[in-house]
Amino acid sequence: MNSLLYPKLFGEAGSHFAAEVERRARGSFTIEVQDRMVLDQDSFGALEAGLIDAVWGSAGHHHREDPALAIFSGFPFGPDPDGFTAWMREGGGAEALDAIYARHGLKSLYCGVLPAEGGGWFRAPVETVADLDGLAMRAFGYGALTLRALGVVPYELPAADIRPALDTGLIAAAEFSLPSIDADLGLHEAAGYLYLPGWQQPATSLELLMPERSWAALSDDHRSAIEAACEATLSWSLAMARERQVAALERFRAEGVMVHDWPEEILAALRRAWTEVIAEEAARDALLAAAWESYLGHVESQGSATAQDYID
């Protein structure tokens, strides 16, 4: 299994999943985890060619091969981990994702979820929408498209390149992942202003991805072991991430990092921009449009338990 998730917690979740599979299959089925044997953009081809058997990652990693997948990694002003899991498990999210992966002959299983990312690390305070205009910032996916609408110049940099880019002044801000994972990269040492919440990704999903033919070829017992391991890893990943999140924020404050809430003016502008971005993206792809309608329908069915409840 090729793991695309370099930062510690992401990779640990993949190893935890593999160990759970072996335990539940009583040693009759094992998964060997390899770190980034194949890069994100090469995963589909490597799976098709049989160079790798499976991928551990998040659907958004494959946005270059299918932009519609980005929404399944978590999206701006979306649900928290509980809400995202409810959509994926019971609200039609898994079926919408299956439809997108089916056009590539792939099968995905929802195996983990992490809490909100940080909203971004900045070298100077951000107080108004005007402060974002022309700002060079590491950003990813739909968050990057939304920021671009407000004048930000987004750079999609891999984890190892973010700190050097801040140090050299190539970028003046960065959003990457959970604060606990950002700490491992030393982002707080290069940009001392952290803004919360992570509006761009209130939840991050983790998945197992393999060819449909490989999933079909597994025995019922081995499929059951994998599904049970996914359930176990889902609980483990969220609990572990939340514990580390609290510790990381306490550490940042002790080290003098300025932790700020986003100004309401900026959040309101970002929300408006996101509404326009997702409308434009959905208009280009019928399956993405169906996925978005699935999510909106799920939110409506939940009454007051909306995405806004989490951000606000």
Predicted regions and their residues:
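N-terminal secretory/targeting leader peptides
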Residues: 1-84, 99-312
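A short acidic, glycine-rich active-site loop
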Residues: 82-92
